[in-house]
């Protein structure tokens, strides 16, 4: 029963899907929902796939993919790309650590954040459009899973830059190998039914490598990770996966 509660809480935390269930959880136990982030990715990928099937016969591929990317942000409340924008505003402000963290917390978008947001949206549309039509559904299903698993991986290898403040701070420094192992097994088990395991492992390995580099670089700059930088990790991991899918032929 506890695991079901954590799964529902993960869905509520990571999406804007209407789930009218109130769940009480101890703050000290909140980090355990990370194990189920890939299932959130499965649900998002499934919804995007159905959306693609519904639109593909009525619009050009470019227009369909524009709708897909836009809808993906509607499903998540744009929380990850907002984190990407805030991260770029902070990291490229040329300020000290405390000032960078303050800038990331500011709800206003700066030039660097706007550029990061625009480039991410454009690149996602571009690579989705250029993925082989035969594996488009595969890419739509798998990419959100990789993005969420990358968040879990990043939380496992870093600590909180804010000393445990914020929702990200409830998990950073607490998510360990157990949570990542569960998330990893869920991801592998799901992918087994969608594409060849060897292909998934290659794409996942590249995405996790990018996640490692990004997470360590950010940690070097601000002393750890935040909820915003975890959002950036998700976006960059998803973009990496899409780039890989462009070169895949199944």
UniProtKB/Swiss-Prot annotation:
Cofactor entry: Mg(2+)
GO CC terms: plasma membrane
Subcellular location: Cell membrane
PANTHER family in the record: ADENOSYLCOBINAMIDE-GDP RIBAZOLETRANSFERASE
Phylogenetic placement of the source organism: Bacteria, Bacillati, Bacillota, Clostridia, Thermoanaerobacterales
Membrane topology recorded in Swiss-Prot or TrEMBL: Multi-pass membrane protein
Molecular function terms from GO: adenosylcobinamide-GDP ribazoletransferase activity; cobalamin 5'-phosphate synthase activity
Organism: Thermoanaerobacter sp. (strain X514)
Biological processes annotated in GO: cobalamin biosynthetic process
Family: Belongs to the CobS family.
Pfam families: CobS (PF02654)
TM region(s), chain numbering: 33-53, 63-83, 109-129, 137-157, 180-200, 203-223
Principal localisation: membrane
Protein name per Swiss-Prot or TrEMBL: Adenosylcobinamide-GDP ribazoletransferase
InterPro entries (alphabetical): CobS
HAMAP family: CobS
């Amino acid at each position: 029963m506890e695991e079901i509660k954590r799964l529902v809480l993960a869905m509520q935390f990571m999406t804007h899907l209407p789930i009218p269930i109130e769940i009480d959880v101890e703050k000290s136990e909140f980090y355990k929902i990370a194990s189920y982030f890939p299932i959130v990715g499965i649900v998002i990928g499934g919804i995007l796939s159905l959306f693609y099937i519904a639109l593909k016969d009525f619009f050009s591929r470019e227009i369909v993919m524009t709708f897909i990317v836009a809808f993906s942000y509607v499903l998540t409340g744009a929380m990850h790309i907002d984190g990407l924008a805030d991260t770029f505003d902070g990291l490229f402000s040329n300020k000290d650590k405390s000032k960078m963290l303050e800038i990331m917390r500011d709800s206003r978008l700066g030039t660097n954040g706007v550029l990061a947001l625009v480039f991410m949206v454009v690149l996602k549309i571009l690579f989705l459009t250029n993925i082989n039509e035969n594996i488009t559904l595969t890419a739509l299903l798998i990419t959100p899973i990789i993005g969420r698993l990358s968040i879990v991986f990043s939380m496992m290898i870093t600590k909180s830059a804010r000393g445990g403040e914020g929702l990200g701070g409830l998990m950073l420094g607490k998510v360990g190998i157990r949570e990542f192992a569960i998330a990893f097994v869920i991801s592998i088990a799901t992918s087994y039914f969608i594409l060849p395991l060897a292909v998934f492992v290659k794409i996942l390995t590249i995405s996790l490598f990018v996640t490692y580099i990004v997470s360590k670089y950010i940690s070097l700059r601000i002393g750890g990770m935040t909820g915003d930088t975890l959002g950036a990790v998700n976006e960059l991991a998803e973009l990496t996966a899409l780039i890989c899918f462009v070169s895949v032929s199944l």
